[in-house]
Amino acid sequence: MYLVGIGGVPGSGKSTLARALASEIPGAVVVPMDGYHLPRASLDAEGLRRRGAPWTFARELFRADMEGLRRNRRGIFPGFDHGKKDPEAGVIEVFEQTPMVLVEGLYVLMGDWGVEAMFDWRIFVDCEFEEAVRRLTRRHMESGLGSSLEVASERARGSDWQNAEIILEDGCRERADMVLRNGEERGGVVGWGEETI
C-alpha cells in the first residue's frame, strides 16, 4: 500500500486532484480530512465562524487513524456529508490489498500535527490567491454557506484565507516532495504545472 498525503490552501484543488488520481488507479481510496471536522453542534459561534481552522478538527483522532493505517494497512474512516455539513462516521474502508490511499486536506503536511512523515509521497497543491477565492466563493454559494455573493466572498477572503496563511507560514509547501501548481479553470479543464522540491 502506497500512502499519499495531499495538502494545500483552501480552494487549491486538493480534493479534485485526489479524485482524479484515484480514478486512474484501480482500487485506490481517498480519505478526506474533512471527515475529521468537529461536528457543528459541538462548536460555539466563533468555532462556526472559523470552521476549517486547525482547532476545529479532531486532530488527535486524525493522527491516531493515520498511525493505525500506516501500521495495519487497513481501517475504517469518516467521510463528510456535504448536505448536513458534518462528518459521517465509518463510511470509507481501506483493505490490506488497497494499492493506494490518498489522504487530502488542509493540514496533512502541518509540522506539529505529526502525520506528514507517515506518507510515502507528499504533494502540495498551490494556487493563485484570486483563483482560490473565486472557487471558494462559488463553493460557499453552492453549499449554502454564503447567503449572498458578498457573504460568500467575505468568508473566502476572511476565515478561509486565515487558514491558508497558517498553512503557508507553517512551511507545508516546503515539506512536500512535489508541488503542483493548479491553474485557472477553463471549460472544466484545470491546467497543472509541476515543480519537484
Residue ranges and their predicted role:
Residues 8:
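The Walker A (P-loop) glycine that initiates the GxxxxGKT/S ATP-binding motif of P-loop NTPases
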Residues 141-191:
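Small-molecule kinase domains that catalyze NTP-dependent phosphoryl transfer to phosphate-bearing small molecules
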Residues 11:
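Walker A (P-loop) phosphate-binding loop of P-loop NTPases
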Residues 85-142:
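ATP-dependent NMP and nucleoside kinases share a basic, alpha-helical "lid"
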Residues 14:
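Conserved lysine of the Walker
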Residues 17:
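Hydrophobic positions on the alpha1 helix immediately C-terminal to the Walker A/P-loop
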Residues 29, 38-84:
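Conserved nucleotide-sensing/catalytic segment adjacent to the nucleotide-binding pocket
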